[in-house]
Amino acid sequence: MGTLACGKAIAAKRYSQNWNEWFWQSCLGKSKCSKGMPGEHFPLAAPRIGRVERPARAQREGSDAVATSYASIASKADLLAADAARDVALCGRSLHVDAQVRADLASAGVHEPTPTPYFVLEELLGKLGLTANDRLLDVGCGTGRVLAHAASQLPCRATGVELDARLANIASSWAASFPQLDAIAGSVLDISLAPYTCFYLFNPFDTAVLTRFLDKAEREAARPFTLVHMSDNGESFAYQGRPGWRLVRSGSIQMFQTASGRSIKFYEFPQHFSVWRYEGMQ
C-alpha cells in the first residue's frame, strides 16, 4: 500500500472510530462533546434525549456499519446508503417507501415522499438552539426521517403529521418506542397547532395551502415560534409582507462535504431555504 493510500486508510479508520463513539453517545444521551465530526454537518448540541436501549451487540454492529458507510462516502449514492443505514440504526427499521405506495401517491397528484438528508437537517434544525421546552412539528413527515433526527440530536419533543395514512403508520410504528416522539395521520390544517414552537416544512404543499397554514399558525401556535422552510423555491414570497414575521436566515444547499473534504453534488440545483420567526402583531 502506498504512503498516500495508507494515510487515507488510517484517516478513514480514525474517522470511523470517532464517528462510532459519537454516534451512539449522542443517541444514548451520553456525549459531552460539543464539536462536530470532521467534514460533516453533525455538531453535538447538548443535552440529548436518550433513546430506547437496544441490545449491546445490535448497537455495536449497527454503529460500526453506519460509521463505516459515512467514512467512505464518495458519491451521492453512498450518502443515500449511509443515511438509510442510519435510519435502521436509529429506528430499528428501514424508512424506505415501497414502489407501490410511491405509484399510488403519484397517481393521486401528491408530491413523492422525499426524506431530508441528515446533513441538511443538522444544518437547518441543529442551529436553532432548541431546548427541552420546545416542541417541533414536522409538516408532511412521511415515514419519519425528521423524527429520527430529533430523537438523537435535538433536546425537544417532536411530532410528525402526515396526510397519507400508510406513511404515517410507518412513522408511528417505530416512533412509539420513543416517549418524546409521536406521529399523526391527517392534515395539518385539521389539528391544533397550540403546543408547537417550531415547524419544519420540506415543500409539503402549494402556495394556496401554505397561506392557509400560515394563517392557522398565527392564530393557534405558541408565540414566538420558528418556522424552517426547506426548498421554498418560489414560495418564500408567501411570508413577505405578513405582519409579525421576521426573516432570521436564508440560503441554499446543494453540496455535501465528505470526511476528506471533497464536495459532492446532492441536489441537481441549489435548494433555497428560509428560517422565519413569528412574534405576533405589535
Please annotate each region the language model reported.
Residues 144-148:
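Glycine-rich SAM-binding Motif I of class I
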Residues 171-172:
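Conserved SAM-binding loop
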Residues 197-209:
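A short SAM/SAH-binding and catalytic strip from SAM-dependent methyltransferases
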Residues 133-140:
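Conserved class I S-adenosyl-L-methionine
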Residues 55, 60-131:
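S-adenosyl-L-methionine
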